[in-house]
Structure formats: structure tokens, C-alpha cells
């Protein structure tokens, strides 16, 4: 279908977002057109402000509006434990638990040879530099439980083996309240593998 140019540009802009296909982009574009002008201006301003005012923490790589970020700057955090995650959204997920009291290192990606992403393309060199600080005693690898995340965790684990730093991997398994019959084989395998004595 042919749309007026301003609508086409809006649709194209929405389609650049992850998970937004043509149908959803059209729906969003027309939703925006039906919004009050003040709401549209507020939405546009929020987008511009987020892009302008946010950056990556120079210590951990988490998204922040100050440097260092509030987590790295928190004196109550255990600086001896570094949890390595793939993306800033993973930090947010971990923080929602309100249990982890260490600090983070955000890789901003994962090793993926199929996509041409190697260790030097994500924040692994920054991690190694950061770990030269003698206070770090444990690195928790909390990358995603997929091929890229596992490859990244294994790569980092091998790099850190000679350092004497304790390297652990988060367990993957069954969700609380989940039924065994609905779990896939990989999840069941990881749950069994990550079992602990009670």
C-alpha cells in the first residue's frame, strides 16, 4: 500500500526497532497519528533526551546518566565480585532480584563467529583490564544460555583460568512453578547439571 511520505518515514523508523515488523510498524504509526500533539512531542523529546543524556559507564559498561554509574559508585557494593552480563537490560533484571550485592561488567554483546563478532568486538578487553585490580576475587558469568552466551562464557573462563580468580557460571534450569513435562531437554539437562546438595 502507498502511504503519504511522512507516514512511510514513520513506518520505516518503527521497523528499525527490534521485533517490529511491517504490520506492527503500521499500527504504531497510526497510533502516533491519533495521539494528542503534546503527547507526541513528549514522546519525541523522551527519545532525544535518552539518546543525548545516556552513555555507558566507563567502569562497567552499564547504561547511565552519570559516570561512574550508581552501581559502580556505591560503596556498599562488594567490589570483589563481578557479574559479567551481555547487555544493560541483564543488569536491570539482576537488580530486580535485590539479592546480588556485587558489581557488574556489561559485555554489550556475545561472541558470534556466524555474525562476525569476536572477543575484541565486545567488552572483553575492558574486562581483562578491570580484573588486573587485585580486589576482584570472583567473576560470575551470567551470559545467556544460548550458543553465543555459552561460547562467550567458555572463552572468558579459559582466559581467566591462569589468573587464580574464582570463575563461576550461573545455573540454568527450571522456572519456579514450572512443570517438568513442559521443560525442554536443554533446560532439564542444565537443571540436573546445576543441582546442589540439600
Curated annotation (Swiss-Prot):
Disulfide bonds: none annotated. One of its GO terms (molecular function) is DNA binding. Keywords: DNA damage, DNA recombination, DNA repair, Metal-binding, Zinc, Zinc-finger. Residues 80-175 form the Toprim domain. GO terms for biological process: DNA recombination; DNA repair. It holds the Pfam family RecR_ZnF. HAMAP family: RecR (MF_00017). This is Recombination protein RecR. It comes from Bacillus mycoides (strain KBAB4). The lineage of its organism: Bacteria, Bacillati, Bacillota, Bacilli, Bacillales. The gene is recR.
Amino acid at each position: 500500500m502507498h502511504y503519504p511520505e511522512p507516514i512511510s518515514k514513520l513506518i520505516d523508523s518503527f521497523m528499525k526497532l527490534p521485533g517490529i515488523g511491517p504490520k506492527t510498524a503500521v499500527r504504531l504509526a497510526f497510533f502516533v497519528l491519533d495521539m494528542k500533539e503534546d503527547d507526541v512531542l513528549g514522546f519525541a523529546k523522551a527519545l532525544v533526551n535518552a539518546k543525548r543524556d545516556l552513555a555507558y559507564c566507563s567502569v562497567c559498561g552499564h547504561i547511565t546518566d552519570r559516570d561512574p554509574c550508581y552501581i559502580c559508585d556505591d560503596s556498599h557494593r562488594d567490589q570483589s565480585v563481578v557479574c559479567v552480563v551481555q547487555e544493560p537490560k541483564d543488569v536491570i533484571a539482576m537488580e530486580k532480584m535485590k539479592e546480588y550485592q556485587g558489581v557488574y561488567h556489561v559485555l554489550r554483546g556475545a561472541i558470534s563467529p556466524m555474525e562476525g563478532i569476536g572477543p575484541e568486538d565486545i567488552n572483553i578487553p575492558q574486562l581483562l583490564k578491570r580484573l588486573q585490580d587485585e580486589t576482584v576475587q570472583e567473576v560470575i558469568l551470567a551470559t545467556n544460555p544460548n550458543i553465543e552466551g555459552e561460547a562467550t562464557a567458555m572463552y572468558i573462563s579459559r582466559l581467566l583460568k591462569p589468573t587464580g580468580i574464582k570463575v563461576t557460571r550461573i545455573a540454568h534450569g527450571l522456572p519456579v512453578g514450572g512443570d517438568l513435562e513442559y521443560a525442554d531437554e536443554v533446560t532439564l539437562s542444565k537443571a540436573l547439571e546445576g543441582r546442589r546438595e540439600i
